[in-house]
């Protein structure tokens, strides 16, 4: 089982009303939430941990998790409000207005941490849930508690507009990355850290600081996976891009699902992946249609919502004409 640990929120996506007026409609979202949903819909045993509100928005989140076969029993259900994000899309790129003060997700503490059984093989962390207090400290404490015995995956998913104290957040990401087995960065994430060197040098930096597998996504140029012994670069797949909301989150699910499906989700095996296993990890074009179509379909629908329902509906094996950007 893979436990995804991080934010769940309601994305208010722009919609036109029946009268032609501008409005918004609620959809379940959040970076780590999206990864959990993708894993569950791929048939990977998945659980999710965060704080979820006992309100109508929280019901949307829980119903979506249940429908995607994600176990939400580790979640802390509280009377605090839900996090709401109003989304503006410009040329497929999203900007957000967040309402997060005192919310169920933000206010979790170490008292809310779940007990984990032997069936939990890996934990996945990242994104904006690592920024504020007290939830940022809470997720870091969970990683510290479990890092010695389970695979740890981290996607910093840097959002500079939400980070008010860059040195503090950078220090947290560095501490967590040093204890993580898998670390995924976008090229924009790496720019934020301000380190010098090309991607090969930057991957070596993070490997030398503790990571066993580093994956770097490069938009239309594809992705590269690194261990201390080898590097594999995989080109991107051509799709029709509607927007990129949740694309990186789905990519994270693809990495974890690939390792799980190939029985490689242990600390020792992640550290010693052969070339084919390394290629499978960052490759959105997995040899199984069911695996490789997930990130491609994600790019072809609007928002991080009903995209994966198309896995069973779409049997066309031929990719569309635009470029997939992880």
Swiss-Prot record:
Recorded superkingdom: Bacteria
The protein here is known as: Fructokinase
Q: What is the lineage of its organism?
A: Bacteria, Pseudomonadati, Pseudomonadota, Alphaproteobacteria, Hyphomicrobiales
UniProt xrefs under Pfam families: PfkB (PF00294)
EC numbers on record: 2.7.1.4
State the encoding gene: frk
Q: Where exactly are the transmembrane stretches of this chain?
A: none
Q: Which GO terms describe its molecular function?
A: ATP binding; fructokinase activity
Going by the UniProt record, its keywords in alphabetical order are: ATP-binding, Carbohydrate metabolism, Kinase, Nucleotide-binding, Transferase
- Compositional bias, Basic residues, is annotated for 287-299
